[in-house]
Curated annotation (Swiss-Prot):
Gene, per the UniProt record: prmA
Localization per Swiss-Prot or TrEMBL: Cytoplasm
Its EC number(s): 2.1.1.-
Source organism: Myxococcus xanthus (strain DK1622)
Biological processes per GO annotation: methylation
Gene3D superfamilies per UniProt: Vaccinia Virus protein VP39
An example Gene Ontology CC term for this record: cytoplasm
Protein name: Ribosomal protein L11 methyltransferase
InterPro entries per record: Ribosomal_L11_MeTrfase_PrmA, Ribosomal_PrmA_MeTrfase, SAM-dependent_MTases_sf
Protein function: Methylates ribosomal protein L11.
Keywords, ordered alphabetically: Cytoplasm, Methyltransferase, S-adenosyl-L-methionine, Transferase
């Protein structure tokens, strides 16, 4: 383990605090600190001014921290950003307190240490988050799980593609709800390895999990899921649309990014459906 970790400090208007917290979470932060003007601070630690928020994301990899910084800068150009290196702390148990189980439709999704609390009668997914995104508790994942639950109820046996699978949670949910061919891809080798571990843990060995590019994935799919960041969704739009036979579900999009993402896919011939929102996050549903 590295002897240092990185802290990304974000200073910006307090009305954007929740959205920034969600974005840092999605971008791979191991933990977040939100400084409150009402709470006592350590000597020498600056609290926010009136109308200001200070959010600090903690990372153990420089590439991840720098990528998160760039995403925040792109989405919140008014933010002041500071990336610092700090002495390493023991994160081995601290991050577990940040992970919560969720109950979405027929699905219960949670970490191994909370499995005993899963309600009877639910379709249970045990997801070990480690360093990949997607345990169910983040709004973007919950929004996608609801879409998977609804689609699979009406289309048993549907072929499903999960782009940017992270922990594999969406692909595993689809398979456990009755999907046919299920493919999960991610360009992060750590995510691929973890998704394969979660696949084995959940008894879904026939999901095709790999680091393949979309151009290497054969066939088209009834349901395509892509819970990644808005800029990447726009960049990959032609490839994602080419794999979509019926329904496309996009997430990882903040409300102010919605119009641009929808336009990219509408221009490729898809029809925008109602979708869903949770806080500052939106889910965009499209039809071939």
């Amino acid at each position: 383990m590295s002897q240092t970790y990185l802290s990304l400090t974000v200073e910006l208007p307090e009305e954007a605090s929740e959205a920034v917290q969600d974005l840092l979470h999605e971008s791979g932060a191991l933990g977040l600190e939100v400084r409150d003007r009402e709470a006592p601070l350590m000597p020498g630690v600056r609290g926010p001014n009136p109308g200001e928020a200070i959010i600090i994301g903690y990372f153990d990899e420089r590439d991840t921290a720098e990528s998160a910084r760039d995403e925040v800068a792109s989405s919140f150009p008014e933010a002041k950003l500071t990336l610092d290196e700090q002495p390493q702390q023991d994160w081995s148990n601290e991050w577990k307190s940040l992970i919560k189980s969720v109950h979405v439709g027929r699905l219960w999704v949670g970490p191994p240490w909370d499995k005993a609390n899963a309600p009877a009668g639910t379709v249970q997914l045990v997801i070990e988050p480690k360093m990949a995104f997607g345990t169910g508790d983040h709004p973007t994942t919950s929004l996608c799980l609801a879409a998977v639950d609804a689609y699979m109820a009406e289309h048993p046996g549907a072929a499903v593609l999960d782009v940017g699978t992270g922990t594999g949670v969406l692909a595993i949910a689809a398979k456990k709800l009755g999907a046919g061919r299920t493919v999960a891809t991610d360009n992060d080798p750590i995510s691929v390895e973890l998704a394969q571990e979660n696949q084995a843990e959940n008894g879904t060995p026939d999901i095709e999990v790999s680091g393949k590019e979309l151009t290497q994935v054969e066939g088209t799919f009834d349901l395509v899921l892509a819970n990644i960041l808005a800029n990447t969704l726009i960049e990959l739009a032609p490839l994602i649309v080419a794999k979509t036979k019926d329904r496309l579900v996009l997430a990882g999009v903040l409300s102010h990014q919605r119009a641009d993402v929808e336009a990219a896919y509408r221009n490729l011939g898809l029809t925008v459906l109602t979708g869903a929102t949770q806080g500052e996050w939106v889910r965009i549903d499209l039809q071939r």
